[in-house]
Amino acid sequence: MPRNAHFRFKQFTVRQDQCAMKVCTDACVLGAWADVEDADRILDIGAGTGLLSLMVAQRNTYAMIDAVEIDAEAFYQAGENVEQSPFHDRITLFHSAVQEFVSEHRYDVIITNPPFFQSDLLSPIDKKNIAHHAKSLDFEELLTAIERLLKPEGKFNILFPVDEGSRFAEKAAHAGWKLTRKLTLFHQEDKKAFRLLMRFERAEVAHNVIVEPDLYIYEKDGVTHDPRFRELLKAFYLKF
């Protein structure tokens, strides 16, 4: 996906020149895939450009969405993106670390594309450190925040690189969460998996796990988008 100053979707535009993390395909898949349809209140942890909040607001036309972002420049740009969208009256942004975020409400659903690549070398640029690494939000802190902010029967949807996702799932299980839905994302069929999308619920209220068929962005030619990918993103991507 091109790293342009802005990215146009069917119902909104995401400006991203002030954000370390640009619009990327895997985040778009999370926004289209996450279990949000029946939620009244949704929390987006690590809002970045506001992409996930905007996608969720388009999919769920009545939910109230709170979005938390620690980086000042990303927070202000997300605010501009939200304000210029059709969903500005249902999305509220907070400039805060989620560890310090206090809400009057608990949430039906949490969605997050958290800092990752815990085992990679740190970038020398602080903004990229925040966006790419769990230095600002490790697994335990994230799970503690979710435990505090999610309703007892709530669900959280999360995106990770494959290795990080497997480690996170182990941590979550030890903390009393059950993986109830999983999607493995590939660039194309002959490539290695590169992302895990997961939904968790508290073990005492959880349903049986749904392991969905692998999703490929492209067909084997590496150019043509896979039909299932097109179907998932057709409400958002202009070219679909």
UniProtKB/Swiss-Prot annotation:
One of its GO terms (molecular function) is rRNA (adenine-N6,N6-)-dimethyltransferase activity. It comes from the Bacteria. Its EC number is 2.1.1.223. This is tRNA1(Val) (adenine(37)-N6)-methyltransferase. Specifically methylates the adenine in position 37 of tRNA(1)(Val) (anticodon cmo5UAC). The keyword Cytoplasm applies. It catalyses: adenosine(37) in tRNA1(Val) + S-adenosyl-L-methionine = N(6)-methyladenosine(37) in tRNA1(Val) + S-adenosyl-L-homocysteine + H(+). InterPro entries: DNA_methylase_N6_adenine_CS, rRNA_Ade_Mease_Trfase_CS, SAM-dependent_MTases_sf, Small_mtfrase_dom, tRNA_Adenine-N(6)_MTase, tRNA_adenine-N6_MeTrfase. Keywords: Cytoplasm, Methyltransferase, S-adenosyl-L-methionine, Transferase, tRNA processing. GO terms for cellular component: cytoplasm. GO terms for biological process: tRNA processing. The keyword Iron does not apply. Disulfide bonds: none annotated. Gene3D superfamilies: Vaccinia Virus protein VP39. It is found in: Cytoplasm. It comes from Dyadobacter fermentans (strain ATCC 700827 / DSM 18053 / CIP 107007 / KCTC 52180 / NS114). Belongs to the methyltransferase superfamily. tRNA (adenine-N(6)-)-methyltransferase family.
